[in-house]
Amino acid sequence: MAQNKPVKKIVLAYSGGLDTSVILTWLKDTYGCEVIAFTADIGQKEELSGLEEKGIKTGASKVYIQDLRLEFARDFIFPAIQGNAIYEMRYLLGTSLARPLIAKAMVEVAEKEGADAFAHGATGKGNDQVRFELGVKSLAPEKTIIAPWRIWSFGGRSDLIEYAKSKGIPVPVTAEKPYSMDRNLMHISYEGGILEDPYKEPDEKMFLLTTSPEKAPDAPEYLELDFEEGNCVAINGKKMNPLEIMETLNTIAGKHGVGRVDIVENRLVGIKSRGVYETPGGTILFLAHRDLESITIDRDTQHHKDKLSIEFAELIYNGHWFSSRMKAVRAFITETQRYVSGTVRIKLYKGICSVVGRKSQVSLYNPEMATFEKEELYNQKDAEGFINIYGLPAQETARLRKK
């Protein structure tokens, strides 16, 4: 439908790879309009080299490369950590968190440039098409969205290469990786290609952020993470901003082989997909933060938050970052973090991240109450009345059903 709708100026989510380079040219040919290429720097490092020059040569009227690393860490990764967001109990949502930020930044560029349409290179089988488009629909509902992979007749990579050569688009001369990869400040994800066999172990050469646990240092390393209201603010006593926290933890945890996960997940579109992830810094933050909550949040609130964390993760995974329900869930999470302040001691050793200590000035843990020795604060005789009342439904059900 978008193909038949006239547009004047398009903002394209651009990576500089084969797909988005072809899309850039295809958009100009198909719509006869100006195309602005947009790239978000969210920690992909060397992938940004030469991108502006390549975009202009491929036909973009302008190329925006925005450094969004601090915003990504502060406004997306850290709130996810506060909410203990983990999809299907395994995936820490590195890619899912990046997409709404990119959509938000593209909308801002579109408003500045007077663009009336957006385009992206996500395929019709994946989750990213949903995340990008829900972001745009939530922030700029009047804009047109163009998804070339759902429109054009190209069947795969060979068709794209043939089109690129016919249009003079530079085709990468390096050998194609036997899998797809997406990198940002939170993680690197690998999927497709040789990873589509869920029984086949990934090649060790694939991993870029983490050392093989077998080759990690033979001595453990200890870290102390300071938190204020659910956010990590210092490592080993040194104050840092969220970007510095992520970069530091990625380096240290990666050295010890921490943060690898190999899973088969359920995509929003109904397909099961194998993903291999490296999330070194995020793994440390997730474990440390959840542990600190255990001494700073009361039982009932914590149990409710644990249930809500599942919904929170699903909202992120499914692209609902800007929804009303997400705002309500985040408001609850923010309230629970008022007293999540303290220090967590972490031990890193050959792929394992262990919490070995925690303390807080506002801790709800009372050793005098918890002790198994004789104490005055807790009268064990009081437990009998509690059990009688608490167990009454079970007792009565059993008694009456025996009649």
From Swiss-Prot:
Pfam families referenced in this protein's UniProt entry, alphabetically: Arginosuc_syn_C, Arginosuc_synth
Q: PROSITE patterns, alphabetically?
A: ARGININOSUCCIN_SYN_1 (PS00564), ARGININOSUCCIN_SYN_2 (PS00565)
Q: Where does this protein hold ATP?
A: 13-21, 40, 121
Instruction: Please list the GO terms describing molecular function.
Output: argininosuccinate synthase activity; ATP binding
Q: Name one GO biological process term.
A: L-arginine biosynthetic process
Q: List keywords of the entry alphabetically.
A: Amino-acid biosynthesis, Arginine biosynthesis, ATP-binding, Cytoplasm, Ligase, Nucleotide-binding
Reaction catalysed?
Answer: L-citrulline + L-aspartate + ATP = 2-(N(omega)-L-arginino)succinate + AMP + diphosphate + H(+)
The UniProt record gives the binding positions of L-aspartate as 123, 127-128
Amino acids binding L-citrulline: 91, 96, 127, 131, 180, 189, 265, 277
Q: Which domain of life is it from?
A: Bacteria
Q: Report the pathway entry.
A: Amino-acid biosynthesis; L-arginine biosynthesis; L-arginine from L-ornithine and carbamoyl phosphate: step 2/3
Q: How does it assemble?
A: Homotetramer.
Q: Which family does it belong to?
A: Belongs to the argininosuccinate synthase family. Type 1 subfamily.
Name of the featured protein: Argininosuccinate synthase
Query: Top-down, what is the taxonomic lineage of the species of origin?
Result: Bacteria, Pseudomonadati, Spirochaetota, Spirochaetia, Leptospirales
